[in-house]
Curated annotation (Swiss-Prot):
Pathway: Isoprenoid biosynthesis; dimethylallyl diphosphate biosynthesis; dimethylallyl diphosphate from (2E)-4-hydroxy-3-methylbutenyl diphosphate: step 1/1; Isoprenoid biosynthesis; isopentenyl diphosphate biosynthesis via DXP pathway; isopentenyl diphosphate from 1-deoxy-D-xylulose 5-phosphate: step 6/6. The active site is at residue 133. The keyword Iron-sulfur applies. This is 4-hydroxy-3-methylbut-2-enyl diphosphate reductase. Pfam families: LYTB. It catalyses: isopentenyl diphosphate + 2 oxidized [2Fe-2S]-[ferredoxin] + H2O = (2E)-4-hydroxy-3-methylbut-2-enyl diphosphate + 2 reduced [2Fe-2S]-[ferredoxin] + 2 H(+); dimethylallyl diphosphate + 2 oxidized [2Fe-2S]-[ferredoxin] + H2O = (2E)-4-hydroxy-3-methylbut-2-enyl diphosphate + 2 reduced [2Fe-2S]-[ferredoxin] + 2 H(+). [4Fe-4S] cluster binds at residues 12, 103, 199. The lineage of its organism: Bacteria, Bacillati, Bacillota, Clostridia, Eubacteriales.
Length: 295
């Protein structure tokens, strides 16, 4: 099987920084115990399992403020997705030792929102509902940041004539979908200022898939199902490159039926996918003998 290794792929700088920070904290005997992560440090179960092996406890499943109430003492780590100011304030009130692993790109978006709202803007924020990154961003200025996921959500919004408006977004969305939605916002409210915050790593990975996937018969994206950026890579392969594409968490999830009749398979991975997981997928495919397997 010929494998096209799409590059860039895998870890982005924000994920690398977050993982390295947790490792350092876990190995530091001076850091108060127990050590908690408020949500998954990044959306990948393999990374979460590594953190748990280091003695770090992952709290997941609710909004960040609710999760925080489960912690009475010790250390709390904020994930790469960022948290709202209310979460930071509550952590200090509880006397917790705080470690902030927020991606610098997310921090920049929070600062942008705060600055815009301080100047009298209402902010339309394009993001995935239920994802922790929009939760933190909307929490920067509750009541002034309006979360929309699709065009239909715009129908519920109304602003006073002359209201200053800005639109920005979650960093890991499809850049094409985001641009299309921003154009719809601009068409409805022409005074809207546009601030596209798709991070460079997301852009580069999506553009690489759009460029290289057409050379393949099949695209496999290695990533966690909760990883928004991984899911967007599948979307790009299917919608822009018009290729069959599948998301797998590990090599064990590859269905041989996908490979039947295929000669070239392109492989990429999400920004939170460990390198060794992707390497195992590539090695499996390179050794896969289509003729033998199809007999």
């Amino acid at each position: 099987m010929e494998v096209i290794k799409i590059t860039p792929r895998g870890y982005c700088h924000g994920v690398v920084g977050a993982i390295q920070l947790v490792r350092r904290v876990a190995r530091d005997p001076n850091v108060p115990r127990p050590i908690y992560v408020l949500g998954q440090i990044v959306h990948n179960r393999h990374v979460v399992e590594e953190m748990e092996a280091l003695g770090v406890i992952t709290l997941d499943g609710e909004d960040r403020l609710s999760l925080l109430e489960k912690i009475d003492a010790g250390t709390v780590i904020f994930t790469a997705h960022g948290v709202s100011p209310a979460v930071k304030i509550r952590a200090r009130e509880k006397g917790l030792y705080v470690v902030d692993a927020t991606c610098p790109d997310v921090t920049r978006t929070h600062e942008l929102i705060a600055e815009l709202v301080s100047r009298g803007y209402e902010v339309i924020y394009i993001g995935k509902k239920g994802h922790p990154e929009p939760e933190g961003a909307v929490g920067v200025a509750p009541g002034h940041v309006h979360l929309v996921e699709r065009a239909e959500d715009l129908e519920a919004l109304s602003f006073a004539p002359g209201q200053k408006l800005a639109v920005t977004n979650q960093t890991t969305l499809s850049q094409w979908d985001t641009q299309a939605l921003m154009e719809q916002v601009k068409a409805r409210w022409p005074q809207t200022e546009i601030y596209n915050e798709i991070c460079l790593a997301t852009q580069q990975r999506q553009e690489a898939v759009a460029r290289m996937a057409p050379e393949a018969d099949l695209v496999i994206v290695v990533g966690d199902r909760r990883s928004n950026n991984s899911n967007r890579l599948v979307q790009v392969a299917q919608e822009l490159a018009a290729r069959e594409a599948h998301l797998v968490d590990s090599v064990e999830e590859i269905d041989p039926a996908w490979l039947k009749g295929k000669r070239k398979v392109a492989v990429t991975s999400g920004a939170s996918t460990p390198t060794h997981i992707t390497r195992a997928v590539i090695e499996f495919l390179e050794k896969y003998n289509v003729e033998v397997e199809e007999r």
